[in-house]
């Protein structure tokens, strides 16, 4: 089990968000799956309101809209006794809206977004197709270990698979 310190923050006005212990367990599952558990790890997960997420996305990615998760990896210039992964900012209203639009349970989508963001902090990306395939497969495997179905399986695909 990963030695994990989580700084869990809720922005003012956020009343609907996963419990800290759940977020901790999702990050730990990601670290354990990747065997990133040989050193203590610290990260921050902030649940943000729409305006804050939009401002950060605009400032750091030049995209003037709120997105589901932003990752800010920390790259230390020196060896530290603990791995400081960085910060995740997850937009509560975007995650809740996406879950509804995609007909997923909100908690399953929250789990996916925390795992997805943690993978970004660990250096995974999805810009190129092969990177996306690798990252998505890791997400599927971690989610499956938590009893959550494939988040990339769309409702249309599910209908096709039952015919």
UniProtKB/Swiss-Prot annotation:
GO terms for cellular component: cytoplasm. GO terms for molecular function: metalloendopeptidase activity; RNA endonuclease activity; zinc ion binding. Pfam families: YbeY. InterPro entries: MetalPrtase_cat_dom_sf_prd (IPR023091), YbeY (IPR002036), YbeY_CS (IPR020549). The keyword Cytoplasm applies. Binds 1 zinc ion. SUPFAM superfamilies: Metalloproteases ('zincins'), catalytic domain. One of its GO terms (biological process) is rRNA processing. Keywords: Cytoplasm, Endonuclease, Hydrolase, Metal-binding, Nuclease, Ribosome biogenesis, rRNA processing, Zinc. Its EC number is 3.1.-.-. Zn(2+) binds at residues 116, 120, 126. Gene3D superfamilies: Metalloproteases ('zincins'), catalytic domain. It is found in: Cytoplasm. Its cofactor is Zn(2+). It comes from the Bacteria. It is an enzyme of class 3 (hydrolase). The keyword Transferase does not apply. Belongs to the endoribonuclease YbeY family. NCBIfam families: rRNA maturation RNase YbeY (TIGR00043). Single strand-specific metallo-endoribonuclease involved in late-stage 70S ribosome quality control and in maturation of the 3' terminus of the 16S rRNA. This is Endoribonuclease YbeY. It comes from Idiomarina loihiensis (strain ATCC BAA-735 / DSM 15497 / L2-TR).
């Amino acid at each position: 089990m990963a030695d994990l310190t989580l700084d869990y923050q809720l922005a003012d006005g956020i009343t609907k968000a996963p419990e800290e212990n759940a977020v901790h367990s999702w990050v730990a599952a990601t670290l354990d799956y990747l065997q990133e558990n040989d050193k203590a790890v610290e990260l921050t997960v902030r649940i943000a309101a729409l305006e804050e997420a939009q401002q950060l996305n605009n400032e750091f990615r030049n995209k003037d809209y709120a997105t589901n998760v932003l990752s800010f990896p920390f790259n230390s210039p020196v060896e530290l006794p603990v791995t400081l992964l960085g910060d995740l900012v997850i937009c509560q209203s975007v995650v809740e809206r996406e879950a509804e639009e995609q007909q997923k349970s909100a908690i399953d989508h929250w789990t996916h977004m925390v795992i997805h963001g943690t993978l970004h902090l660990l250096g995974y990306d999805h810009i190129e197709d092969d990177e996306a395939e690798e990252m998505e497969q890791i997400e599927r495997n971690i989610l499956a270990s938590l009893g959550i179905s494939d988040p990339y399986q769309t409702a249309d695909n599910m209908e096709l698979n039952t015919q």
